[in-house]
Structure formats: structure tokens, C-alpha cells
Amino acid sequence: AGAGQGEVGVAPPSPARGMVYVWPMAAAETPAETFKRALANAARALAEQAELEVHFGSDGPRLSNGVLTLPHPPRDPGAPESATLRGQADRLALRLANHDERLNARLRPVDQTAAEVFDAVEQARVEAVGARELKGVRNNLNAALLTRLEKSGALRAEAERVPVAEAAALLVRERLTGEAAPDGAKTMLD
């Protein structure tokens, strides 16, 4: 069936009722555009912010002034990079839903190393909230974690050279979720 002939899209949840509405998809929507729309709507739902602005650009992933910016998705939404992108979106959406910036600023240590550990542990805490309850979110977060650790070089570092903040976050994540570190990251804790 062509667009408008049985194909549907999903709208963000209604803040008043928490419901999702359905509307016809645009005729020319590509799989990448469908993926972007689904990813943005999932981030809004996870963040519990129906009006959350989600942008795609080369400067993502980041959260700034209430705007979630994500990297452009791969052309093939089934590509392994898609799980990483979903994890990046979930990570930031969970931060919006479960992080108190004022409290964090008040409690954050002044010492740089202590502040890095504090920030990493706080991010592990907010991610654990979603990972404990939602298997898909847990899988996405694991994919994003492994990609982030690989890009930072932490997976290739000897145990004594792993950044203390990364190791602390992995330990807190394990404690809060009951899930061992992903296979690629276990050597960081040896």
C-alpha cells in the first residue's frame, strides 16, 4: 500500500493522556527518515518530555539547553551502528528524565578527578533506571557503552591505565543493574 493507504506513523505521546496518536506517513519518507522519527519519539517518551526537540547533526550526541542532538543515522537502519545511536539517544533521554542538575551542581566535588568520577557514577545511575526496567534500552545502552569505550581507547588500555571514572561507572552500573560489564569491557575491571 502506498502512503496514505494504510501506512501509519507515530506521534509523540500526549502530555495530557500519555497516549500515542497515529497519522499517515509522508509518501517520500525514506527508511532513514522513518528511523529518525521513531528514534526522536522514543527519546521523547523515555525522557517523559513530549515536546523535546531532537535534532540530527554532526555535533551529536549531546544535550544542550533542552535540545537533544544526535548523529545522523546510517543509511541502513538495521546496521549495527543503529544500536549505538539508539543507546546514545536513550542515554541522554534517561538523563533528562532522572537527573537533577541543581542537586548535581551542589554536590559535585571541586577536585577534577573526583568530579569526573562523580559525573560518571551519576550517569551510570540514571542509565541504570532505564536498563533495569527495559531490556531494549539495556541492549542499546550496552552498544553505546562499548562504542564509547572503544573510541576513547579504554578497551585497549591496561587495567592500571583505565580512567578511574570509567572503571567506577562500570562498577556502579554492575551494582545497580545486577548485570556484569559487557564482554568487551570486563578486562577494564581486572
PLM segments and residue spans:
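Compositionally biased, low-complexity segments
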Residues: V8-V10
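Glycine-biased, low-complexity coil/linker segments
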Residues: A1-G6, R17-G18
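Intrinsically disordered, low-complexity segments enriched in serine/proline and basic residues
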Residues: P12-P15
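Basic/hydrophobic alpha-helical interface regions
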Residues: V20-D190
